[in-house]
Amino acid sequence: MKIILATSNKHKVLELKEILKDFEIYAFDEVLMPFEIEENGKTFKENALIKARAVFNALDEKQKKDFIALSDDSGICVDVLEGNPGIYSARFSGKGDDKSNRDKLVNEMIKKGFKQSKAYYVAAIAMVGLMGEFSTHGTMHGKVIDTEKGENGFGYDSLFIPKGFDKTLAQLSVDEKNNISHRFKALELAKIILKILNKG
């Protein structure tokens, strides 16, 4: 069984390939011509399913027998911002780049009079294939701070300190991050489903 990732985000592709290294993984653009997918769901799960369905439906009939489309939709929910940016995390600033998104998050938090806040990451993984549709979830709790720290990671990692740590995700090694991340937790559950489907 082969897995096609329904993302063109290079950071996500690397992270997903690392965590799912027991499987034969292909990035979206290794199999299909890239195309835009409108994420108009109201939850992380809905958006993950929209992406996985779109990619699976773009495969030809032979490919559909060989591939499962796997998608991740994830984001950060900040308490003092009433759960925002949430499903809009990737495009929070309107510009769609990580630095602008981080700057906006910090500015919104400071406007409300806070230098830090409880926050949590959410990841929803969706899998779509001939055998049906499946989804898993993972969360990681901690806090966001108003100063970026660390060079690793992407997204909001340089602002997020996981519970039980005194470093941001961007200060942790790839292995340290992958062992505690929301995406890792969701993918560990997804692996169980994928192994069952592979036997089926």
Curated annotation (Swiss-Prot):
Enzyme class: hydrolase
EC number(s) from the headed UniProt entry: 3.6.1.66
List of catalytic residues: 73 (proton acceptor)
GO cellular component: cytosol
Cofactor(s) listed: Mg(2+)
Cofactor descriptive note: Binds 1 Mg(2+) ion per subunit.
Protein origin, superkingdom: Bacteria
GO terms under biological process: nucleotide metabolic process; purine nucleoside triphosphate catabolic process
Disulphide bonds in the chain: none
Reaction it catalyzes: XTP + H2O = XMP + diphosphate + H(+); dITP + H2O = dIMP + diphosphate + H(+); ITP + H2O = IMP + diphosphate + H(+)
UniProt: Mg(2+) binding residues: 38, 73
UniProt entry keywords in alphabetical sequence: Hydrolase, Magnesium, Metal-binding, Nucleotide metabolism, Nucleotide-binding
Residues annotated for substrate binding in this entry: 7-12, 74, 154-157, 177, 182-183
Recorded GO MF terms: dITP diphosphatase activity; ITP diphosphatase activity; metal ion binding; nucleotide binding; ribonucleoside triphosphate phosphatase activity; XTP diphosphatase activity
Pfam families: Ham1p_like
Known role: Pyrophosphatase that catalyzes the hydrolysis of nucleoside triphosphates to their monophosphate derivatives, with a high preference for the non-canonical purine nucleotides XTP (xanthosine triphosphate), dITP (deoxyinosine triphosphate) and ITP. Seems to function as a house-cleaning enzyme that removes non-canonical purine nucleotides from the nucleotide pool, thus preventing their incorporation into DNA/RNA and avoiding chromosomal lesions.
HAMAP family for the chain: Non_canon_purine_NTPase
Subunit structure: Homodimer.
Family the entry assigns: Belongs to the HAM1 NTPase family.
Protein name: dITP/XTP pyrophosphatase
Organism: Campylobacter jejuni subsp. jejuni serotype O:2 (strain ATCC 700819 / NCTC 11168)
Organism placement in taxonomy: Bacteria, Pseudomonadati, Campylobacterota, Epsilonproteobacteria, Campylobacterales
